[in-house]
Amino acid sequence: MPTIQQLVRKGRHSKKAKVATAGLKGSPQRRGVCTRVYTTTPKKPNSALRKVARVRLTSGIEVSAYIPGEGHNLQEHSMVLVRGGRVKDLPGVRYKIIRGALDTQGVKDRKQARSRYGAKKGQ
């Protein structure tokens, strides 16, 4: 336990809360360029090939972002819009790509929850 004199000299330092989406630098979304598009397998009880992209954000940070929905048109050098939100069964994937923004097309033939996947009404 510090003495009063030590507290006068140094004071107490409060711990900073850890930010889940540090790459966004406080923004709701960030633009980025795909550096690699690949598939990966999820953690233990689940089995699939999840679509993931490595994205270099405008903040200069490179992150892994999940590509939601069925089918996508992304490849290397595609411009994407990234938001926060982790994928529970993919370790290290803490961002999601927004469908229907910039170079990312919306999900084709999507009827429900269309706004989440960038699908227009009559398509």
From Swiss-Prot:
GO terms for molecular function: rRNA binding; structural constituent of ribosome; tRNA binding. Keywords: Methylation, Ribonucleoprotein, Ribosomal protein, RNA-binding, rRNA-binding, tRNA-binding. The keyword tRNA-binding applies. InterPro entries: NA-bd_OB-fold, Ribosomal_uS12, Ribosomal_uS12_bac. Pfam families: Ribosom_S12_S23. It comes from the Bacteria. Residues 1-31 are annotated as: Disordered. The modification 3-methylthioaspartic acid is found at residue 89. GO terms for cellular component: small ribosomal subunit. GO terms for biological process: translation. Residues 9-18 have a biased composition (Basic residues). With S4 and S5 plays an important role in translational accuracy. Belongs to the universal ribosomal protein uS12 family. Part of the 30S ribosomal subunit. Contacts proteins S8 and S17. May interact with IF1 in the 30S initiation complex. NCBIfam families: rpsL_bact. This is Small ribosomal subunit protein uS12. It comes from Corynebacterium aurimucosum (strain ATCC 700975 / DSM 44827 / CIP 107346 / CN-1) (Corynebacterium nigricans). The lineage of its organism: Bacteria, Bacillati, Actinomycetota, Actinomycetes, Mycobacteriales. The gene is rpsL.
